Amino acid sequence: MRISIFGLGYVGAVCAGCLTARGHEVIGVDVSSTKIDLINQGKSPIVEPGLEALLQQGIANGRLRGTTDFAEAIRASDVSMICVGTPSKKNGDLGLEYIESVCREIGYVLRDTTRRHTIVVRSTVLPGTVKNVVIPILEDCSGKKAGVDFGVAVNPEFLRESTAIKDYDQPPMTVIGELDSASGDILQALYEELDAPIIRKPIEVAEMIKYTCNVWHATKVTFANEIGNIAKAVGVDGREVMDVVCQDKVLNLSQYYMRPGFAFGGSCLPKDVRALTYRAASLDVRAPLLDSLMRSNESQVQNAFELIEAHDKRKVALLGLSFKAGTDDLRESPLVELAERLIGKGYQLDIYDENVQYARVHGANKDYIESKIPHVSSLLNANLQQVIDNADIIVLGNRDEQFRALALQAPAGKQVIDLVGFMNKPTSTTARTEGICW
């Protein structure tokens, strides 16, 4: 494949070396004549183990060359990869001036070409950037239509400095965000020899995946550091703690708890977060990430309330009251907190929870229900169908399988608010569904 790479910094130079090593013809493009001279001499413009050998090989076999001539590189290639930097502005926003400049250059050249060209954004950009910035510039400068006259895709990179060659050759996954299937097909062909799953998604999803991965990595580092600081303050080696924590691949390092949805609750998590952050504060150990957990959890309850409030209807069915399905435990259930807010704002609320109904009469939580939340428990209704029929808004609060079946057959005319991820789309033309995070 003939590929032009715009930007010969860290990402661009690594991609150039790895692509030529796999037999592709690559033209490296940069405004810096110094970088171009280095590339054409087979020298790496960055420090990265193994890269210079790949560049030397590419120059020697004629598959790699560098140029400052944007137009010539575009005309001589079928795919253009944008790998320019996206530096932070003073306010923290993303600087897109380099991407905008490259897109203008590409667009002007496309105006005079008849071959279909595919533009691939490898630079890290926020969701909506390709749709709202890249494509409009390309279309305006070329006079052509994206997805029809030329292709557009996003291909986020997951290269780590000092291990970039290995990361390119052995990725955990290859993410392709495609505007049109033809562009996705081209990138899939480019990467199909790599032993990694190829995941094709809409462009905005691919953009968000990249940021989510990076922020998750930053979160893990910060979490481990804060745990380590608290551990040291209580006379424990934080490394020993985290070594054991990381051995749990069922809960700690897994997909469990990693699905967007409603707030956490129950008798353990809220209590233990508060206890540990209190101890940290008493020892003068700063733990801003851990300190933020309860505030963030509270914010998710408020988000759910605002979803309901936005629909200007007063009859609400809350399906689920315990903090999770399969239990009658109401201690610190975020659904109880949500119910309290709805009651306080004058909503007509009916609640259905099979396990809590049982507990109300027989269970160990009977005293808790009657003493702590009698005003909420009085709204419990044992007739699920009646609860649904009386409501304008149906809130799916926990993952009881009864509610999944209901979600798939949502009554026409009802507004369904899904807090747990049962529904992907409305079940009829008149049923409406909205998820808390989707």
Swiss-Prot record:
Protein name, UniProt field: GDP-mannose 6-dehydrogenase
Enzyme class name: oxidoreductase
InterPro entries: 6-PGluconate_DH-like_C_sf, GDPman_DH, NAD(P)-bd_dom_sf, UDP-Glc/GDP-Man, UDP-Glc/GDP-Man_DH_C, UDP-Glc/GDP-Man_DH_C_sf, UDP-Glc/GDP-Man_DH_dimer, UDP-Glc/GDP-Man_DH_N
Molecular function via GO: GDP-mannose 6-dehydrogenase activity; NAD binding
PANTHER family in the record: GDP-MANNOSE 6-DEHYDROGENASE, UDP-GLUCOSE 6-DEHYDROGENASE TUAD
Entries under SUPFAM superfamilies matching the protein: 6-phosphogluconate dehydrogenase C-terminal domain-like, NAD(P)-binding Rossmann-fold domains, UDP-glucose/GDP-mannose dehydrogenase C-terminal domain
Xref: Gene3D superfamilies: 1.20.5.170, NAD(P)-binding Rossmann-like Domain
Pathway: Glycan biosynthesis; alginate biosynthesis
Residues that, per the record, bind GDP-alpha-D-mannuronate: E161, K210, N214, H217, N225, Y256, Y257, R259, F262, G265, K324
The reaction(s) this protein catalyses: GDP-alpha-D-mannose + 2 NAD(+) + H2O = GDP-alpha-D-mannuronate + 2 NADH + 3 H(+)
Domain of life per record: Bacteria
UniProt EC number: 1.1.1.132
Function: Catalyzes the oxidation of guanosine diphospho-D-mannose (GDP-D-mannose) to GDP-D-mannuronic acid, a precursor for alginate polymerization. The alginate layer causes a mucoid phenotype and provides a protective barrier against host immune defenses and antibiotics.
Keywords: Alginate biosynthesis, NAD, Oxidoreductase
GO biological process: alginic acid biosynthetic process
Family: Belongs to the UDP-glucose/GDP-mannose dehydrogenase family.
Chain residues that bind NAD(+): Y10, V11, D30, K35, T86, T124, K271, R331
